A protein has these predicted regions:
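Residues lining hydrophobic/aromatic ligand-binding pockets adjacent to catalytic sites
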Residues: 1-167
Length: 167
């Protein structure tokens, strides 16, 4: 039913990387991308090399690194309450630049959605990759995250934020 659609599989338990060769063989047989995840690392976490296993596409998913709240939290979104730093975003950007030489298409998904962190980090990643930002944003975003001033600019007459480097 889904054979005409690209498939990506996100595996989180270490048992999948204990026999990495067999896991890759299984994924490759089904032309499925091995989702490269960024999350806190524990003994039971999967081990990954951040390299693509197929050439059709690459999928990076950033959950955040809030290890203190990953397993023990009052609200489920607390585990994703993590704002990546500029160097961490830069590392993702460098990885994406490298894999784009190998794959036809790459995707990066920021899943650290608590407190709008996913939006902030996605904008920073797009800026790092010199990708155009066409969306407008509420000015409250830059008040809360002043580091976005280099990425977004305020247009007073419209009372929205627009990309600072609009092409």
């Amino acid at each position: 039913m889904f054979k005409d659609y690209p498939a990506a599989v996100e595996l989180r338990h270490r048992s999948w990387s204990d026999d990495f060769g067999e896991t890759l063989k299984l994924l490759n047989e089904h032309h499925a991308a091995f989702v490269q995840i960024d999350e806190p690392k524990f003994k039971t976490s999967i081990r990954q090399n951040q390299l693509p296993n197929i050439t059709s596409f690459y999928y990076l998913r950033a959950h955040g690194r809030n290890w203190k709240k990953w397993w023990r939290h009052e609200q489920k979104d607390e585990r994703y309450d993590y704002l990546y730093t500029a160097p961490e975003i830069g590392k993702f950007g460098e990885t994406l630049k490298a894999v784009e030489k190998i794959v036809k298409k790459s995707y990066a998904y920021t899943n650290n959605h608590a407190n709008a962190h996913a939006i902030v980090n996605a904008l920073e990643l797009k800026d790092f990759l010199r990708q155009p930002i066409h969306e407008d944003f509420n000015p409250e975003l830059i008040k809360r995250y002043p580091e976005l001033k280099k990425v977004l600019a305020v247009v007073p007459q419209r009372d929205v934020l627009v990309p600072a480097h609009r092409s």
